[in-house]
Amino acid sequence: MASLKELLPTPKAAASTFYDHSSDPWFKERYGGESAQSDAAAAAAKPSGPAKPVPPYGKRGGFVPRRPEDFGDGGAFPEIHVAQYPLGMGRRDEKGGSKILALTVDAKGSVAFDAVVKQGENASKIVYSKHSDLVPKIATADSEATADDEEYQKQIEETTERTKAALEKVVNVRLSAAQPKNVPTHDSESKFIKYKPSQQSAAFNSGAKERIIRMSEMAQDPLEPPKFKHKRVPRASGSPPVPVMHSPPRPVTVKDQQDWKIPPCISNWKNPKGYTIPLDKRLAADGRGLQEVQINDNFAKLSEALYVAEQKAREAVQMRSKVQRELQLKEKERKEQELRALAQKARMERTGAPPAPTGVPAGGGRGAVDDREEDMDLEQPREQRRESREEREARIERDRIREERRRERERERRLEARDAAMGKKSKLTRDRDRDVSEKIALGMASTGGAKGGEVMYDQRLFNQDKGMDSGFATDDQYNIYSKGLFTAQPTLSTLYRPKKDGDSDVYGDADEQLEKVMKTDRFKPDKGFSGASERSGKRDRPVEFDKQEENDPFGLDQFLTEVKKGKKAVEKIGSGGAMRASGGSSMRDDYEGGGSGRSRINFERGR
């Protein structure tokens, strides 16, 4: 080890094991310096004794600070678990009523002697205790400027130098960071550190008691990308807020308390506290009367425009559908005439009739076909005017039955009017006071329901063969409803009419109620619009939907028409098309025309 110490350079700073703070300037100034130390050495018999140096960190096991000198120029020691009072902070005074004030200094470091007059009730007041407070402000400023001019200028220069140095440092760092070619120079001198390892046995560190390490700074690559992301530092707080000058406090009166009282919220849905709120307060809180409701005229214009547009669209759709139907009818007539002309031509060729004139084109021409159609139309009324004896007798019988039924209906209306005037229930009006459910159960709401005479009780309400107990319907009936609902027009007129004798004194007569309801235009605009009229009439019964029935699904009407016309085999010529060369093996031999399996052949007029 001796040879190694000789080789190593002399250390710059030797680390001491303890620090003696008694020779510091602050200790001499605070506790009297050398004279205080000599007095303390002379009075060694006193319990306080001289100031002891503070042991270094890690070796303060038996050190217990009791006096202010033991703390040095710092605070308490956290590793020593005893009650510590550095500079007397936190220590309770022995005398509770002590009037000794703590020594305070001002911003310049001078002792503030006016603290004596600024205690107690004067603590919150402004006390003028200086001579400068009595001198006018202008004279004070002039005297202070002349007296402190040199000192103030010196402070300005020092502050300027420090600010300049700080700004140059920041600017140089920014410039060096922006210019990577300027590699910052580092102190390449190595440092030697001697220390004692914690493990002092011969098995570790080759039995050495001390170790010396060499510490040097690691070289940095100037082209290496940055390892850390720069984050924005939040801006520091500026000047303190401006003090707000308040008026002197005053006691709160009862009126102020009432003015500050906020009433509870009035809700139309919730009332958790169970308050009883009058209706006038509730309406006032609603705010309905605060503003006047004004309806914009554009709403009426918009509804009128929509109504007119809808009517025009409906008219356009109807016109288009009408034109389309006319075009389809014309096209159908044209094709029928062409087929009829072709059939006539084929029939002429088959029978050997003379051919058509050369001036007429193939197919007979449109003019010839029209002439023949007119002749056939003229012959049909002549045949219809011929009436046989049996037909004439049947017609006379039908007229007689129709006249008898008309007289019977007039008689029933006269009887019903007479019974209504006498207050007697007629056959048609005796069931009007029944409930709707009873009418439905009795089958009175349908046209096919049986209607018997008036009895004490109606047997149709009991022992019905249709219901949930009897399977709800017959076995061969697939519909869940056995009969139509609301299909009788007389019954519908009574279902929607109020009862005759019910509450007539309160609501008026039934006819008056019905008339009032019928005249009520609830869903119509208040103002009429020009060019827009109600196309549909008033509805006096519910909406009914009829099942769409196919027209002649089995072709019976067409079959009967062909039988009545009495077609012959010769008339089939030309109806099967121009190509009929099958030898009986076609699948459509049973149909009219036979021949090819094609469903239709479109013929075009020759050009």
From Swiss-Prot:
Record field: compositional bias (Basic and acidic residues): 327-339, 379-434, 516-527, 535-550, 562-571
GO CC, alphabetical: nucleus; spliceosomal complex
Biased composition (Low complexity): 35-49
Keywords for the protein's UniProt record, in alphabetical order: Coiled coil, Nucleus, Stress response
Induction trigger: Induced by drought, cold and salt stresses. Induced by wounding and treatment with abscisic acid (ABA), jasmonate (JA), salicylic acid (SA) and ethylene.
Region (SNW): 190-353
Region listing for Disordered, in residue ranges: 29-77, 178-205, 217-265, 327-434, 516-607
Pro residues biased stretches: 240-251
Tissue specificity as recorded in UniProt: Widely expressed.
InterPro entries: SKI-int_prot_SKIP (IPR017862), SKI-int_prot_SKIP_SNW-dom (IPR004015)
Chief place where the protein resides: nucleus
Top-rank lineage group of the source organism: Eukaryota
Quaternary structure and partners: Interacts with FLO6/SIP4. Interacts with DIS1.
PANTHER family membership: NUCLEAR PROTEIN SKIP-RELATED (PTHR12096)
Function field: Acts as a positive regulator of drought and salt tolerance. Acts as a positive regulator of cell viability.
Miscellaneous section: Plants silencing SKIPA exhibit growth arrest and reduced cell viability. Plants overexpressing SKIPA exhibit drought resistance and significantly improved growth performance in medium containing stress agents (abscisic acid, salt, or mannitol).
Homology family: Belongs to the SNW family.
Protein name (Swiss-Prot/TrEMBL): SNW/SKI-interacting protein A
Organism encoding this protein: Oryza sativa subsp. japonica (Rice)
Gene behind this protein: SKIPA
